Regions:
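Acidic/histidine-rich catalytic neighborhood of metal-dependent amide-processing enzymes
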Residues: 1-48
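Metal-dependent amide/peptide-bond hydrolase catalytic core
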Residues: 36-41, 45, 51-56, 60-175
Length: 175
């Protein structure tokens, strides 16, 4: 039995196709991902895992001119968290992090009571993914009156292994 499954939402995390992918993968002995080859035409036998996360920080709104001390800025907190998140990146090991968007606040004269950041993290191994998830789970607020919550998950990496190489060699022979 051969199943071909085309999806169109890979670049946004396979949100609608994820379950179909998992269902077919669970019933399959082998899976080929028909992603474009490398620039020199070489096939890929490994692929980084991709983590898509959202950080939501809540604070306490206050008038910035009348009583700024009664507020707790979600924007100031998220700025501190972004600096800490940068420690996750390690280009030498292939771990990359991008804060794609930050949103927060309502007006310049109001201490922001909410801020959000979208986070993209790429990892070469499942061990790296677990370490990153643990790091994100342990984040704590640094400013009194704020809270930090992170949600999201990883699409696991394809790590080069003996079984992956065997499948690659079989595909080469058949081609």
């Amino acid at each position: 039995r051969i199943v071909m499954l085309w999806t169109t939402d890979e670049e946004i995390g396979s949100e609608t196709s994820r379950q179909a992918i998992l269902d077919h993968a669970d019933r399959s002995e082998a899976v080929f991902v028909m992603e474009p080859s490398l620039p020199n035409g070489a096939l890929k036998t490994s692929r980084k895992g991709c983590g898509q996360f959202e950080m939501i920080v809540t604070g306490v709104a206050a008038h910035a001119g009348i009583e700024p001390g009664s507020g707790a800025s979600a924007i100031h907190e998220i700025a501190k968290q972004v600096v800490e998140l940068q420690s996750l990146g390690d280009n030498d090991r292939g771990v990359s992090l991008n804060i794609g968007t930050i949103q927060g606040g309502s007006r310049s004269n109001v201490v922001a009571d909410e801020a959000r950041a979208s986070i993209d993290i790429r990892v070469p191994t499942q061990t790296d993914a677990l370490q990153v998830q643990d790091f994100l789970r342990r984040l704590e607020s640094k400013i009194a009156g704020t809270t930090v919550k992170v949600s999201g998950s990883f699409r696991p990496p394809l790590e080069r292994s003996a079984s992956v190489i065997r499948l690659y060699e079989m595909a080469q022979r058949v081609a």
